[in-house]
């Protein structure tokens, strides 16, 4: 494994240098949580919610909602935040410093989990028996500013956000995310319509977790397609192009358009379907 890592980082660093030399910046993801079988948990069990024998006591997930009656049971180890705070968030600083050394911009997944997180007793079969716990909130943000400065981070802030989460994001100064596909739910478009975007944001037609925009067009309800066409003043067959243009024309400081959308590819080019196993992360150009 050491040899594989050596070759990987040698090749990756060469690729990054080439891309940067052409004016291309690389954006990478970092999940908020680690895997139960990760080296992170094995080497630092004291930083996670475990008993004295390396067994998890609480795990991560999402509460029940209209889309999942039992919630989502992710099963990741939860952090022992008081211990992290006592160490000045040293482990997190090292983790983020490494990420920013191999990427130019880092997107933190499930950013809201730093304000409060959903905790489920280990061994539960569903997420229904969980509860919310307070996270490190601004203490974590201040530690990241100290270690990294104030730029180079994208906060994945999708979904329901409490006033406390919004306040934490505002204090961080990190741009949040806007998804164009979410704007055209004719039942509830929320703050995803382009005219509502703040400048300090990153807009996507869709992410790796969404169907392609052409796939969205062909699978969305007639009401949603009609809503999008009215808003964008286009014909249904031109929706993908119009949504791309709306992203690029928005006031958001950054727009990210997946390659499959530039090529107008359908659902067969979807990268990932959350909470499923199977043919995920297999699409190739």
Describe every region a protein language model picked out.
Residues 1-11, 33-256, 260-262, 267, ...:
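Alpha-amylase-like alpha-glycosidases and glucanotransferases acting on alpha-linked glucans and related
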Residues 6-33:
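Conserved, well-ordered alpha-helix/loop/beta-strand core segments that scaffold catalytic motifs
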């Amino acid at each position: 494994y050491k040899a594989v890592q050596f070759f990987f980082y040698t090749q990756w660093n060469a690729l990054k240098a080439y891309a940067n030399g052409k004016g291309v910046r690389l954006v990478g993801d970092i999940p908020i949580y680690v895997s139960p079988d990760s080296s992170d948990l094995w080497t630092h069990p004291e930083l996670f919610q475990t008993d004295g024998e390396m067994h998890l006591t609480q795990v991560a997930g999402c509460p029940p909602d209209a889309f999942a009656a039992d919630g989502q049971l992710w099963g990741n180890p939860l952090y022992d935040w008081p211990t992290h705070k006592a160490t000045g968030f040293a482990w997190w600083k090292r983790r983020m410093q490494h990420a920013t050394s191999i990427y130019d911009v880092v997107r933190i997944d499930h950013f809201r989990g730093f304000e409060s997180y959903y905790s489920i007793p280990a061994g539960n079969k569903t997420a229904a028996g969980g509860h919310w716990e307070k996270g490190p909130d601004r203490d974590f943000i201040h530690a990241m500013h100290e270690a990294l400065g104030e730029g180079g981070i994208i906060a994945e802030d999708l979904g329901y956000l409490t006033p406390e989460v919004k306040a934490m994001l505002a204090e961080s100064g990190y741009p949040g995310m806007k998804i164009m596909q979410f704007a055209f739910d004719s039942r509830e478009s929320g703050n995803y319509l382009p005219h509502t975007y703040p400048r300090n944001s990153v807009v996507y037609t869709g992410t790796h977790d969404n169907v392609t925009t052409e796939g969205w067009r062909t699978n969305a309800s007639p009401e949603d397609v009609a809503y999008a066409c009215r808003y964008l003043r286009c014909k249904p067959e031109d929706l993908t192009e119009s949504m791309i243009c709306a992203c690029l024309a928005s006031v958001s400081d950054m727009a990210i358009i997946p390659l499959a959308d530039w090529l107008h590819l359908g659902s067969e080019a979807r990268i990932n379907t959350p909470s499923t196993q199977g043919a995920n992360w297999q699409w190739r150009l």
